[in-house]
Curated annotation (Swiss-Prot):
Cofactor (UniProt): Mg(2+)
Organism superkingdom: Bacteria
Lineage: Bacteria, Pseudomonadati, Pseudomonadota, Alphaproteobacteria, Hyphomicrobiales
Family membership: Belongs to the FBPase class 1 family.
Protein name: Fructose-1,6-bisphosphatase class 1
InterPro entries listed in its UniProt record: FBPase_C_dom (IPR044015), FBPase_class-1 (IPR000146), FBPase_N (IPR033391), FBPtase (IPR028343), Fructose_bisphosphatase_AS (IPR020548)
Keyword entries, A-Z: Carbohydrate metabolism, Cytoplasm, Hydrolase, Magnesium, Metal-binding
Cofactor binding notes: Binds 2 magnesium ions per subunit.
Disulfide bonds: none
Quaternary data: Homotetramer.
Pathway: Carbohydrate biosynthesis; gluconeogenesis
Residues annotated for Mg(2+) 2 binding in this entry: 126, 129, 287
Length: 340
């Protein structure tokens, strides 16, 4: 018996059978105009979206063609690499080189990959954030940052020199959040047309939140100040904060970012006493920087606990950093505890 057939998709009340919202490609074309750096930026983003469309097709097939989570090596920091990590890296590098970028820094390669000698932009990318969730139906994503390639080391510039940044969240829909410095825009992939269509513009975070995203299992390893922050929040309305807090933790920075950008919240992944976590765990150049760029464009903040992420000058390509981002008021409150 055939359980699944070639059926038309479910249509809900109020649904339209046509997607008429502007495509991201059309938006980027209008934004870029005839400016050479903007055109290079637009082409890089289009290449990433093309790769995302191809990658999600493989993600959706799960274990059918083979094990996407098969271990095949280690990256520069000795993190285990899965088959899908390497495949997604190769995919995005190929597309970005074809798009004419000057160089690509990927989590899955020790050194930047050279592109077009006279390219105007450089792209830092984590091809598949949260790959530990592969095959589990949990969040996965791609996150990227675009810098001007007008200096010898484009990836060792502070984040405030970013031209654009964004992420693609592979969930029950394929969603894009990005900014070219003119506010945060959301878009969703239409699987019929293969195009990302804009769904929201000028996204802003709320002024207050009671949602926290962090790994509670490591609380005992946090500094005294950070433990006090967590304890005070968990005391709820009977504690010094005077209100109850909820906890959300998706185990992938892109997943938590996407939720917070829509619902508000505070994410933190800071340094702690465990070996290898003394400086935090997320990568500054291609994780913390794009998140901080989007946070700023959404009227919120991102710090390493005390310093704005966008002001930090990286010393190495794969430098790690503590990261706190989300609703500005809560970032400031956490910062007061962080320095205790």
């Amino acid at each position: 018996m055939t359980l699944v057939g070639n059926f038309s998709p479910l249509v809900l009340v109020g649904d339209s059978d046509r997607v008429e919202a502007e495509t991201v490609g059309a938006y980027l074309d209008g934004w870029a105009g005839h400016d050479k750096v903007r055109l290079a930026t637009a082409n890089a983003i289009k290449a990433i979206l093309s790769g995302a469309g191809r990658l999600v097709g493989r993600i959706a097939r799960g274990y059918l063609p083979g094990d996407p989570g098969k271990l095949v090596g280690v990256n520069s920091d000795q993190d285990q690499q899965k088959s899908i990590d390497v495949g997604s890296h190769n995919l995005f590098v190929e597309l970005l080189i074809a798009a004419g970028v000057a160089s690509i820094l990927s989590e899955e390669a020790d050194l930047p990959v050279a592109g077009k000698a006279d390219g105007l932009v450089a792209v830092a990318i984590d091809p598949l954030d949260g790959s530990g969730n592969v095959g589990l139906g949990a969040p996965l994503g791609t996150i990227f940052s675009i810098f001007p390639a007008d200096v010898e080391e484009p990836f060792l510039q502070p984040g405030n020199r970013q031209i654009a940044a964004g992420y693609v969240s592979y969930g029950n829909s394929v969603d894009l959040g990005f900014s070219v410095g003119e506010g945060v825009i959301f878009a969703t992939l239409d699987p019929v047309s293969g195009q990302f269509h804009i769904t929201r513009r000028n996204v802003k975070l709320p002024e207050r939140t009671s949602d926290l995203a962090f790994n509670a299992s490591v609380q005992r390893h946090l500094s005294a100040g950070m433990q006090a922050y967590v304890n005070d929040a968990f005391l709820g309305k009977d504690g010094p904060r005077g209100r109850n807090f909820n906890m959300r933790w998706l185990g992938a920075a892109v997943g938590d970012m996407h939720r917070i950008m829509q619902r508000g919240g505070l994410f933190f992944y800071v340094n702690d006493s465990r070996p290898g976590y003394e400086k935090g765990r997320l990568r500054l150049v291609y994780e913390a920087n794009p998140i901080a760029f989007l946070a700023r464009e959404a009227g919120s903040k991102a710090t390493d606990g005390s310093r704005p992420i966008l002001d930090i000058v990286p010393q190495t390509y794969h430098e790690r950093s503590a990261l706190v981002f989300g609703v500005a008021e809560e970032v400031d409150i956490l910062g007061e505890y962080f320095v205790k």
